[in-house]
């Protein structure tokens, strides 16, 4: 999974004022990496209206609706580290992982991310990381 994280798609010390702004930043990074079309960003917002993507332990995993599968060019991940946190439906989120999965791969990606974040120590390491490499290492160790 760590191979889907490029250093260009890991953003440290992000400051956002809202959940919507965080979704837009994550979605734009997926667009910029060539993983999705622009329409996918709206699909991420649409999903959030139906069900929150807050996963617990300070993590949210925004992703598009099932109808948005046609907007996914290839699988991709982006990570926003938000040390100050952002309100996410009444919860504090410090890490946003935007995902786009091609050919049903999003369920596997969701599962691997959730497993990594199920350990509070991993969450702390990601929130406190000073480089993209440190964050990638947490995922590599969890995936081993």
Swiss-Prot record:
Localization per record: Cytoplasm
InterPro entries: PTrfase/Anion_transptr, PTS_EIIA_type-2_dom, Sugar_PTS
Subunit structure: Homodimer or homotrimer. Seems to be a monomer when not phosphorylated.
Keyword tRNA processing found: no
Organism: Staphylococcus aureus (strain MRSA252)
Keywords: Cytoplasm, Kinase, Phosphoprotein, Phosphotransferase system, Sugar transport, Transferase, Transport
Protein name: Mannitol-specific phosphotransferase enzyme IIA component
Domain (PTS EIIA type-2) ranges: 3-142
Residue numbers carrying Phosphohistidine: 63
Active-site residues, Swiss-Prot/TrEMBL: 63 (tele-phosphohistidine intermediate)
A molecular function GO annotation: kinase activity
């Amino acid at each position: 999974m760590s191979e889907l994280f490029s250093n260009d798609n890991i953003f440290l010390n992000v400051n956002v004022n809202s959940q919507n702004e965080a979704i837009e930043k994550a979605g734009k990074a997926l667009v910029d990496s060539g993983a999705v079309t622009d329409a996918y960003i709206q699909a991420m917002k649409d999903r959030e209206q139906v069900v929150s993507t807050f996963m617990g332990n300070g993590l949210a995993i925004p992703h598009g609706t099932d109808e948005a599968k046609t907007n996914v060019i290839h699988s991709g991940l982006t990570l926003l580290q938000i040390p100050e946190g952002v309100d996410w439906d009444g919860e504090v989120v410090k890490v946003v992982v935007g995902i786009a999965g091609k050919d049903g791969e999003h369920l596997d990606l969701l599962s691997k991310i959730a497993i990594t974040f199920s350990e509070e120590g991993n969450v702390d390491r990601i929130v406190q990381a000073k480089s993209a490499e440190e964050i990638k290492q947490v995922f590599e160790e969890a995936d081993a």
